[in-house]
């Protein structure tokens, strides 16, 4: 049988696969109901911009155009585990017409090149503003950057890191020792060519 392997590994692997596959299946269902096209990406060690469409650009990944055939069942199980390493998180930028860039950092430490933005852009803080990703704030430069972070807890000593707190324009969905807010809203002002803060919560973490 192809399932001949260490029992603990097999049980843990199946549990992890089941958990992750259910997440993927749910996302796929929601996408199909909305008529969205589903695409698969794989991480790339090289930092290069790959234009996708609809204004999205991938910064550290490439679109999978050909599915690789796996040799055996165990290779299939290993492939399904999906990496837990945050460095493999995919980073995307979105821009359309004259709207400045919105950068989605996920949990990535994407710092292979230093970038300076001259326009008023929005960047999501990588890994909820974790100290493990603190070097990102040195590699992404600009005077008008708006940093936004989400979190599901507000008593984590490692986030947000001091580098996030030191940013001039920073916003939190969950500030330390303060209540959660449901959303942070910005609206693009075409006249002044900038993002206007509408509602939410400025960072009050200390």
Question: Over which residues does each language-model region extend?
Answer:
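Flexible, acidic/histidine-containing loops and adjacent segments that form or flank the divalent-metal
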Residues: 1-101, 179-180, 189-206
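Active-site-proximal loop/helix segments of hydrolase catalytic cores
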Residues: 75-156
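Short, structured coil/loop segments at alpha-helix boundaries
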Residues: 18-21, 135-137, 157-161
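C-terminal regulatory/interaction regions
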Residues: 108, 156-206
């Amino acid at each position: 049988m192809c399932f001949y392997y260490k029992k603990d590994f097999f049980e843990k692997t199946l549990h992890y696969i089941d958990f992750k596959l259910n997440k993927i299946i749910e996302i796929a269902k929601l996408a199909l109901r909305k008529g969205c096209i589903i695409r698969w990406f794989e991480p790339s060690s090289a930092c290069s911009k790959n234009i996708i469409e609809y204004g999205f650009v991938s910064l550290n990944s490439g679109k999978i155009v050909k599915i690789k055939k796996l040799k055996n069942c165990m290779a299939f199980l290993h492939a399904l585990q999906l990496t837990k390493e945050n460095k493999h998180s995919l980073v995307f930028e979105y821009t359309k017409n004259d709207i400045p860039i919105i950068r989605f950092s996920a949990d990535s430490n994407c710092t292979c090149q230093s970038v300076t933005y001259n326009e008023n852009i929005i960047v999501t803080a990588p890994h909820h503003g974790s100290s493990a990703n603190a070097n990102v704030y040195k590699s992404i430069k600009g005077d008008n950057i708006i940093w936004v972070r989400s979190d599901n807890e507000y008593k984590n000593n490692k986030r947000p890191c001091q580098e996030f707190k030191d940013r001039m324009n920073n916003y939190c969905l969950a500030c330390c020792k303060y209540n959660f807010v449901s959303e942070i809203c910005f609206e693009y002002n075409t006249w002044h060519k900038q993002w206007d803060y509408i509602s939410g919560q400025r960072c009050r973490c200390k």
